[in-house]
Amino acid sequence: HGYSRLALIPAFDDRAGLASPILPNSVHGAIGAIIRERQESERLAARGISPTRSAILVGPPGVGKTLSARWIASSLGKPLWVLDLTAVMSSLLGKTGNNLRAALDHAKKHAAVLLLDEIDAIAKRRSDESDIGELKRLVTVMLQEVDQWPDSGLLLAATNHPELVDPALWRR
């Protein structure tokens, strides 16, 4: 399995429950809205509306991005799978696109909540002159995957450096 080399694992299984993290009201409200949409996905689908399928969590280290992702997954009764993209980049350059796609396909099949940690490691602005061609191709892979993410799953990304993330990813 290609995804096994990417350390895609059910990193946190808080389905028994996890207390709501202490967050600013605006952040708590935005995350709560995503949870409510996901919980009401059948009612939304009956009206031809798709729930939120992806979100980017932003902030400096230690602010609670991973804890927030855990809370979202727990509230939805699903485990949180974490894919550390920094590790992916350091170990698999040359095969990263295929392996990333395999990991994402695996997560789709299991309707998991998937957190792409350190999204800025691969989803850099395509205008970055210092970037190598493979990284630019990875941005394209990520954009295609986000566009095709099923309503049954939730794709989260986390970054400490929002200014490095390709603007096209923000629009999704």
Predicted regions and their residues:
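Interdomain "pre-motor" coupling segment immediately N-terminal to P-loop NTPase/helicase cores
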Residues: H1-G17
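ABC-family P-loop ATPase nucleotide-binding domain
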Residues: A19-I22
